[in-house]
């Protein structure tokens, strides 16, 4: 099946689902998940999204004299403060290009497709923006996505709840929790409807899940690695990932090494 054929079939795929049969495992769900983001899309997003939260930004402020700036000679031999380290960035940019994990992705879904409850890989910061969706009319239903989000500080309670009450390990992305399960949860749950132009920021290690609605939703997503997320990855996320035999994709120790090299020069 080509992407064109898939896009033309989304209306038919959407019409399968009703409020009474959405849990039927026999219904066909075709979700284009984790596909490479087209270069033209990534370039346009780079022009729109603030640089400090965009993919592979190098953590350097545009102004001089920022936090961490040091005195250094300019082209005239005068000592001036250089550029400081920005409060946000993506330390994946410290790695040589051939070592970087490609995580600028796209998601194309229809009513009934979903992302099961999970946490972002290696405790990274997640970013998800809806760039296009169907609208009511011409045989289509308005597209949006429903997010169920939790907080980083309650991650242990969430993990225990999923394991003891729902019978699923949050480290294994296989279970989509029902609304009633979220209602009974002993922790805060944030339900958000994402529409075109909405940027969802996903905290590190915060379990979340997504349900797609309507005929079509198209989203772009990326992850960022920072000093704080690296600490969480080394001490918590990676040991848990090893317990379920999940490969490390982000080369966290290499990121630390190359970042120290970069900023010590």
PLM region descriptions:
Residues 2-198, 206-265:
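Active-site region of the double-stranded beta-helix
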